[in-house]
């Protein structure tokens, strides 16, 4: 979970978080400014891609973003969830869910995945904005209201 506030509406992808390996298989939470202005959650290693229909253009607003991944769930749409400002996002332009019992690149035990906050690979796709209270919790999926937040 993280609080984010954009500084500009630019172009291209800007990463709030990325987990990458040498073959560019990526797990990420980020924003896309190619005219979309969306906040997305994806993990190429397990074919996860959640891209909401909603757009987020307000440069004065803080967005509280929570993503939860639990691939042990039997229902595909319960394996990956996204909440923005405490509301679960259920309308997506793209919604690809991982297979059951698969391990994504975020917090991957094996492999050489490097985790970065605010960048894709340390030298590109920097997040142009503010981040607050970036928290990773492994082993459990918390409710989006387990932490206080303000918009």
PLM regions and their residue ranges:
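Short tryptophan-centered beta-strand motifs in secreted/extracellular beta-sheet-rich domains
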Residues: 2, 60-71, 82
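Beta-strand-rich, repetitive solenoid scaffolds
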Residues: 17-20, 27-34, 39-43, 68, ...
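Extended recognition patches within non-cytosolic domains
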Residues: 74-76, 93-96, 130-151
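Extracellular glycan-recognition modules
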Residues: 1-40, 73-76, 140-146
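Short, solvent-exposed beta-strand-to-loop segments that form ligand-recognition rims
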Residues: 84-112
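Short hydrophobic/aromatic patches on beta-strands that form ligand-binding or substrate-lining surfaces
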Residues: 1-11, 65-67, 117, 131-136
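Short, aromatic/His-centered strand-loop micro-motif at the edge of beta-sheets
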Residues: 41-64
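Extracellular glycan-interaction patches encoded by glycine-rich segments
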Residues: 105-131
């Amino acid at each position: 979970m993280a609080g984010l506030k954009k500084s500009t509406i630019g172009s291209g992808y800007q990463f709030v978080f990325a987990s990458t390996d040498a073959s560019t298989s990526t797990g990420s939470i980020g924003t896309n400014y190619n005219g979309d202005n969306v906040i997305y959650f994806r993990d190429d290693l397990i074919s996860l891609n959640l891209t909401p229909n909603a757009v987020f253009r307000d440069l004065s607003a803080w967005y509280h973003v929570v993503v939860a991944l639990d691939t042990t769930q039997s229902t595909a749409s319960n394996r990956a969830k996204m909440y923005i400002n405490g509301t679960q996002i259920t309308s997506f332009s793209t919604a690809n869910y991982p297979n059951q019992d698969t391990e994504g690149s975020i917090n991957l035990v094996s492999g050489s995945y490097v985790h970065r906050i605010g960048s894709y690979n340390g030298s590109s796709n920097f997040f142009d904005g503010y981040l607050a209270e970036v928290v990773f919790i492994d082993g459990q999926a918390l409710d989006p209201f387990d932490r206080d937040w303000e918009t």
